[in-house]
């Protein structure tokens, strides 16, 4: 498939164009579609609102500003949907511990949303965990007693076969930062290009700003403040429930 290079974030993209792109991408594996949509958000401003703009407005789509969790939500929804409406339907499944509910065009139960990356992993909704395939695993236990198995930063394999486009990377906090038992401190998405592995992530801080960036994974690993990573992967032909 010949694919044009798109770099305009969906926030400025009419739904008809999104629908056309979704149709064009339909034959690609899920991971390739996820990476494609993630890259379209590069340059999008970071969402500085503490709970997220989408939660504040009680909406499904709020593409003008994104944080790492919304970027993950929206990228996967666009990748797995057959059209914009289908992506919104998928959002009500993927973003929630149970299922989202919409009344009069507004989400009415965002208190049921995933708020922690570790819960996304454990739910099984966000792909199969492949942490053990990325490198030698270790275990960390925070002050609350909650523990997590992960790949330490220095043991993460960056061989050509380790990651695939569309893999979701959950960055594990060091024990001293696991306040309240929060294991995952950041989330990003992998994009592979020949022999290079990139991380696409919403780089910023609440109330300080930032933007979505695409960086070499190795470069980010060398400076990141996290202990290591956990990784999930969707099957190539993933099917969403009705």
What is the predicted role of each segment?
Residues 9, 15, 20-23, 29-35, ...:
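Mature, folded catalytic cores of secreted/periplasmic enzymes
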Residues 7-11, 26-28, 143-155, 206-217:
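Short, exposed beta-strand "edge-strand" segments with a Pro/Gly-rich flavor and a Y/T-containing core
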Residues 1-6:
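Bacterial N-terminal signal peptides
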Residues 137-178:
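A mid-sequence, solvent-exposed acidic-amphipathic segment
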Residues 37-38, 72, 134-136, 153-156, ...:
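Generic detector of short, locally flexible boundary/turn motifs and exposed helical patches
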Residues 8-141, 146, 179-180:
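N-terminal capping segments
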Residues 65, 162, 177-184, 192:
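Short amphipathic alpha-helix initiation/capping segments at coil-to-helix junctions
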Residues 165-168, 174, 185, 190-242:
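Low-complexity, Gly/Ser/Thr/Pro-rich intrinsically disordered linker/tail segments
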